[in-house]
Amino acid sequence: MAELKDQLSLLGRKTEYKQDYAPEVLEAFDNKHPENDYWVRFNCPEFTSLCPITGQPDFAEIRISYIPDIKMVESKSLKLYLFSFRNHGAFHEDCVNIIMKDLIKLMNPKYIEVTGIFTPRGGISIYPYANYGRPGTKFEQMAEHRLMNRE
């Protein structure tokens, strides 16, 4: 297992904020307990993006929950990644799916779900939800069950 400080380039260093969508800032580190199934949850209450049509800002709380396997996302890199959506034009549903797919690519988790709780615009709230369970495992069935039993 590589030294933790060798795996991470952002933590403990001066922060450079990207001005547009930047999945390359995401960093992962080794899970010290890959034999255990356990949840990791991030609540990101200050997410912003832009409406791709009007350019108006959209505000949301993004909730990310996952069951790690070998890799885990480093929280400062996640913060910078989410911040990179600030000037990015995407619909709410796109943001949630993009975030989930980027995290799957980074970590290959056993299971992940991402929820966006967007502030109402025009009197309508949008709460997109996306999830993934690793194919061929109990987590695939878990993902289907959680998706089909959402409110």
UniProtKB/Swiss-Prot annotation:
Its EC number is 1.7.1.13. GO terms for cellular component: cytosol. Its main location: cytoplasm. It holds the Pfam family QueF. Pathway: tRNA modification; tRNA-queuosine biosynthesis. It catalyses: 7-aminomethyl-7-carbaguanine + 2 NADP(+) = 7-cyano-7-deazaguanine + 2 NADPH + 3 H(+). Substrate binds at V73, E74, S75, H92, E93. The active site is at C51, D58. One of its GO terms (biological process) is queuosine biosynthetic process. It is found in: Cytoplasm. GO terms for molecular function: preQ1 synthase activity. It comes from the Bacteria. Keywords: Cytoplasm, NADP, Oxidoreductase, Queuosine biosynthesis. Belongs to the GTP cyclohydrolase I family. QueF type 1 subfamily. Catalyzes the NADPH-dependent reduction of 7-cyano-7-deazaguanine (preQ0) to 7-aminomethyl-7-deazaguanine (preQ1). HAMAP family: QueF_type1 (MF_00818). This is NADPH-dependent 7-cyano-7-deazaguanine reductase. It comes from Bacteroides thetaiotaomicron (strain ATCC 29148 / DSM 2079 / JCM 5827 / CCUG 10774 / NCTC 10582 / VPI-5482 / E50). The gene is queF.
